[in-house]
């Protein structure tokens, strides 16, 4: 039967619950445990699909087309054998929506619908369903202990601990042990109060993960254990690390996996973390450095491009290259030519996905620079659409645009997808008036690459599967004039013949794709497209 480890956070947000939980999952997986992970988000949005990247960061897309929290990206990157799906992320909004739909159908037989038991029962059913078929399920609860929004989730966890018993449920709590510079010491009181807050709602942590930017002394560890009623060996020190991929080793060296296996009655071999050691060794000991200019409109918050950042890091690990990302505000680039110096200093240029017209002229400016100066260029999603628009305007000399930016454009080289088949093979129909949430081409889709194209050479195959998140596509009636002018259409969707990729034959490395390759990159091997891109950047740097 599935065992559950619930993960909560206290004192402050952004402690790294997702990374810590994923690191623990990686260690358990290295011991042969079949493990999965789920993120519970207390906000009322049904999913993060329409949330501002400035507030929420990246939206991570799963194979089955779910728009989810960026922590699911960490889960997939740390785990070898588990892929996330719609069942691995749910919000308060989704829970309430499900309960209200049941009430409308009369499933509660006219009863008064309440937070307890109806909302908590729905949460419990989702948790249990997400763990089916696995040895261990790690359940991360978003937010911070004490937040009013998370109380129904905390109550559901409390009930599950009682119902499942000690041998099937554990609670792991992350907390901050701050260092007070003026006093020259770390302070345990915030951790004590965080656990006190948990205990006030009926939850006692079995494991404490103590986050700090300074060393925590053995005396403070004993003090934390004494005043939080947690075994001393279950008080785990987790200081800031040079690489997040060091965390599995950090947890393992403090015997956290042994403690969990003992509690759950799991007799398993020792964890083999040699793969993680190799990743860390390559990351911390690069042999060269390249700079990638990322031109976007959410660059003030790097988490908005978390999977791309990680994919570039993974490619750097693969080639033993330190990939430095120089973020350029696309909107500022439109009018500030001084920012062109950053493009000049870059070894490669990347334009990521995005929505809306704001900043597009700055991105087009960067694409023109990359094309004319033979700088390696990678366009993703909107980055491909703008590469097509740039080429049409500056090479074909037509006033091309996207109907997303100008519905009345005379040359709609990019247009709204009105019909397509989703990941289940079901017909989806959209219009300009459709809801924004959940109305895109989402999830894993098959594509066919043109034999002999650069992209086919990069993948080593002509049939690939990549994840998508977009509602606009290239207009196929422009394929012939573009190809006659020198742009190669190198990939098409397998069923609808939608354009998936373009490239330039007279450019050392100019590739743009409609899909999102960053979602499937791994620290153990990277992703073929990003690996090739970083290699091209390295070659460009060496040839300067």
From Swiss-Prot:
Protein keywords: ATP-binding, Glutamine amidotransferase, Ligase, Magnesium, Metal-binding, Nucleotide-binding, Pyrimidine biosynthesis
Binding annotation for ATP: 14-19, 71
MF (Gene Ontology): ATP binding; CTP synthase activity; glutaminase activity; identical protein binding; metal ion binding
EC number of this enzyme: 6.3.4.2
The Glutamine amidotransferase type-1 domain, residue ranges: 291-543
Binding site for CTP: 13, 147-149, 187-192, 223
Top-rank taxon, per record: Bacteria
PROSITE patterns: GATASE_TYPE_1
Entry binding sites for L-glutamine: 354, 382-385, 404, 471
Amidoligase domain: annotated segments: 1-266
Recorded metabolic or biological pathway in which this protein acts: Pyrimidine metabolism; CTP biosynthesis via de novo pathway; CTP from UDP: step 2/2
SUPFAM superfamilies: Class I glutamine amidotransferase-like, P-loop containing nucleoside triphosphate hydrolases
Function summary: Catalyzes the ATP-dependent amination of UTP to CTP with either L-glutamine or ammonia as the source of nitrogen. Regulates intracellular CTP levels through interactions with the four ribonucleotide triphosphates.
Protein family membership: Belongs to the CTP synthase family.
Protein name per its UniProtKB record: CTP synthase
Gene responsible for this protein: pyrG
């Amino acid at each position: 039967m599935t065992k559950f480890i619930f993960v909560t956070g206290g004192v402050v947000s952004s402690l790294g619950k997702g990374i810590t939980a994923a690191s623990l999952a990686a260690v358990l997986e290295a011991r042969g445990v079949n493990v999965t992970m789920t993120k519970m988000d207390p906000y009322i949005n049904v999913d993060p699909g329409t949330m501002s990247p400035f507030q929420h960061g990246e939206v991570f897309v799963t194979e089955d087309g779910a728009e989810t929290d960026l922590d699911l990206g960490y889960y997939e990157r740390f785990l070898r054998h588990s892929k996330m799906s719609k069942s691995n992320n749910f919000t308060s909004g989704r829970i309430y929506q499900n309960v209200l739909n049941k009430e409308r159908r009369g499933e509660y037989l006219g009863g008064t619908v309440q937070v307890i038991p109806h909302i908590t029962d729905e949460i419990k059913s989702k948790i249990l369903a997400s763990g089916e078929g696995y040895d261990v399920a790690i359940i991360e609860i978003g937010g911070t202990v004490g937040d009013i929004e998370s109380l129904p989730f905390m109550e559901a966890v409390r009930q599950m601990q009682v119902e499942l018993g000690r041998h099937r449920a554990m609670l792991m709590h992350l907390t901050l042990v701050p260092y007070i510079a003026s006093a020259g010491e770390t302070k345990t009181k915030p951790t004590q109060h965080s656990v006190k807050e948990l205990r006030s709602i009926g939850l006692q942590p079995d494991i404490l993960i103590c986050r700090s930017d300074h060393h925590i002394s053995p005396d403070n560890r004993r003090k934390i254990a004494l005043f939080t009623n947690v075994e001393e060996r279950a008080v785990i020190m987790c200081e800031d690390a040079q690489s997040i991929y060091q965390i599995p080793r950090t947890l393992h060296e403090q015997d956290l996996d042994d403690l969990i296996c003992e509690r759950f009655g799991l007799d398993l071999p020792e964890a083999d973390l040699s793969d993680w050691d190799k990743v860390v060794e390559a990351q911390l000991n690069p042999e060269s450095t390249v700079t990638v200019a990322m031109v976007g409109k959410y660059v003030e918050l790097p988490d908005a491009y978390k999977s791309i950042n990680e994919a570039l890091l993974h490619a750097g690990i693969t080639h033993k290259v330190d990939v430095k990302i120089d973020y350029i505000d696309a909107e500022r680039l439109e009018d500030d030519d001084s920012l062109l110096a950053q493009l000049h200093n870059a070894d490669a240029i990347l334009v990521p996905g995005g929505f809306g017209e704001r900043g597009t002229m700055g991105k087009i400016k960067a694409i023109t620079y990359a094309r004319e100066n033979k700088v390696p260029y990678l366009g993703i999603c909107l980055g491909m659409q703008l590469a097509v628009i740039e080429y049409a305007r500056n090479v074909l000399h037509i006033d091309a645009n996207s109907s997303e930016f100008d519905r009345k454009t005379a040359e709609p080289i990019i247009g709204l997808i009105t019909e397509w088949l989703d990941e289940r093979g079901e017909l989806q129909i959209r219009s300009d008036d459709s809801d924004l949430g959940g109305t895109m081409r989402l999830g894993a889709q098959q594509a066919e690459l043109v034999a002999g194209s650069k992209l086919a050479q990069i993948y080593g195959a002509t049939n690939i599967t990549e994840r998508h998140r977009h509602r606009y596509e290239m207009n196929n009636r422009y394929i012939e004039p573009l190809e006659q002018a020198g742009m190669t259409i190198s990939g098409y969707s397998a069923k609808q013949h939608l354009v998936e990729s373009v490239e330039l034959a007279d450019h050392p490395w100019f590739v743009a794709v409609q899909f999102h390759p960053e979602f499937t990159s791994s620290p153990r091997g990277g992703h073929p497209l990003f690996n090739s891109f970083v290699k091209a950047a390295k070659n460009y740097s060496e040839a300067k």
